[in-house]
């Protein structure tokens, strides 16, 4: 499902073959530690098992409830309260599969404490009906706790206790935590977050699957793609495992070439939030003990008009990873409305996706040939539920190996607590 292209990386395939050989033994050893669940952070490898060993009854119930919400044409709005992996991965999946406009339902995400944004959304929803999805393992995440108070109380005011709970689903811990307690007290429908799956790996669990189902995605196809990726990446031989090939090249660029930034490039607006997911995935997994590549995401050609100058001729502390989709969800033919008055007559009758792909290949040529930038290309055929699930789990295996190559625990994020503890101390004064 995934094809890697190394044509524009170092000197091409000859270079990558040498690198793969140098990493082969180390990769095999680390792969065994992952598969045998003996690696650093092994207690948080549940995302590897989930696509094939999930609770069948819970997912059946999740699909039934999400389809019921999706089929209710009277309620057009869905509000998702989540932050980090409880937001980014959810949105990445929905945006990956659905067209940007004319969706069956409008979805709004509350993932910050911007008073202006929250006020505007509340004012809109005072006049309209909406469903509410709250996602938090503990229920003590401040951003989500505050948002839940505001939006659940709005439902309560509009529809009463019964109406509010009918329009709400909580995704939280199976047994414990503040949100679990509130959901049980209020008799709110819940689905559980597995104990052994961290936030940035969790979009393939009810964390992401419920909202995806509400928006019309086929949950089973997402899980099918995930399961295939996990199976494909069990292979210990780096020559046969694209996830480990990519992990090895990332580590090589960091440790041997002193490239400390990775720029993720996409040419489709719908893929932007997948690169936001990658930003969190790699930053939280690798950024420890003074180590790690800083992930940066770019939407081309838009960002070529802002950071393009730096990428072409600036401080070359980075390499690029470009993700592309062969077949667009939809396409547009350039009309002959102005004939050649604008000097663009040579584009008459051409498809917009073709023009976009020419821009992509031209940028790759300019960056690699002229700018001497090393570029890894990740190519997929289609945007759909299965390809999203596959790529999501494929990158999860990449980051597991990447973190272990750096000799850090890829599955914790202790540094995130620093701002939280200071924030709570100040707020309680």
UniProtKB/Swiss-Prot annotation:
Reaction it catalyzes: alpha-D-glucose 6-phosphate = beta-D-fructose 6-phosphate
Main location (coarse class): cytoplasm
Transmembrane segments: none
Pathway(s) annotated for this protein in UniProt: Carbohydrate biosynthesis; gluconeogenesis; Carbohydrate degradation; glycolysis; D-glyceraldehyde 3-phosphate and glycerone phosphate from D-glucose: step 2/4
GO biological process, one term: gluconeogenesis
CDD domains in UniProt: SIS_PGI_1 (cd05015), SIS_PGI_2 (cd05016)
Protein name per its UniProtKB record: Glucose-6-phosphate isomerase
Organism: Malacoplasma penetrans (strain HF-2)
């Amino acid at each position: 499902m995934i094809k890697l292209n190394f044509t524009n990386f170092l000197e091409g395939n000859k270079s990558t073959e040498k690198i793969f050989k140098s990493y082969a033994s180390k990769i095999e050893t680390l792969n065994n530690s992952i598969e045998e669940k003996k690696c650093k952070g092994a207690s948080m490898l549940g995302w590897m098992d989930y696509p094939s060993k999930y609770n069948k009854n819970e997912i059946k119930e999740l699909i039934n409830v999400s389809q019921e919400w999706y089929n209710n044409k009277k309620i057009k709005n869905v509000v998702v309260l989540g932050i980090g992996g409880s937001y980014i991965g959810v949105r990445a999946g929905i945006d990956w599969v659905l067209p940007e406009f004319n969706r069956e339902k409008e979805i709004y995400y509350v993932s910050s404490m911007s008073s202006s944004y929250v006020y505007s959304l509340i004012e809109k929803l005072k006049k309209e009906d909406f469903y509410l999805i709250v996602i938090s393992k503990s229920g003590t995440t401040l951003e989500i706790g505050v948002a839940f108070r505001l939006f659940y109380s709005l439902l309560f005011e509009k529809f009463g206790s019964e109406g509010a709970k009918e329009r709400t689903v909580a995704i939280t811990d199976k047994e414990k935590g503040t949100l679990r307690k509130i959901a049980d007290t209020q008799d709110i429908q819940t689905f559980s977050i597995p104990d052994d799956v961290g936030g940035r790996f969790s979009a393939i669990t009810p964390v992401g699957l419920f909202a995806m189902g509400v928006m019309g995605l086929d949950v089973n196809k997402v899980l099918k793609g995930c399961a295939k990726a996990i199976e494909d990446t069990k292979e210990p031989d780096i020559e046969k495992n694209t996830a480990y090939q990519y992990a090895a090249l990332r580590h090589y660029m960091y440790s041997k070439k002193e490239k400390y930034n990775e720029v993720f490039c996409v040419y489709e607006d719908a893929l932007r939030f997948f690169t936001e997911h990658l930003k969190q995935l790699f930053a939280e997994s690798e950024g420890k003990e003074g180590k790690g590549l800083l992930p940066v995401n770019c939407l081309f050609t838009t960002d070529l008009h802002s950071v393009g100058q730096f990428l072409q001729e600036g401080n070359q502390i980075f390499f690029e990873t470009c993700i592309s989709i062969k077949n667009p969800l939809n396409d547009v033919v350039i009309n002959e409305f102005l004939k050649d008055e604008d000097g663009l007559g040579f584009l008459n009758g051409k498809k917009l996706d073709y023009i976009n792909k020419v821009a992509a290949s031209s940028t790759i040529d300019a960056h690699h040939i002229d700018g001497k930038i090393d570029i890894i290309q990740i190519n997929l055929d289609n945007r759909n539920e299965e390809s999203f699930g596959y790529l999501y789990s494929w990158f999860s295996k990449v980051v597991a190996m990447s973190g272990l190559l750096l000799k850090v625990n890829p599955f914790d994020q202790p540094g995130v607590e620093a701002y939280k503890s200071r924030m709570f101390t100040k707020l309680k004064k």
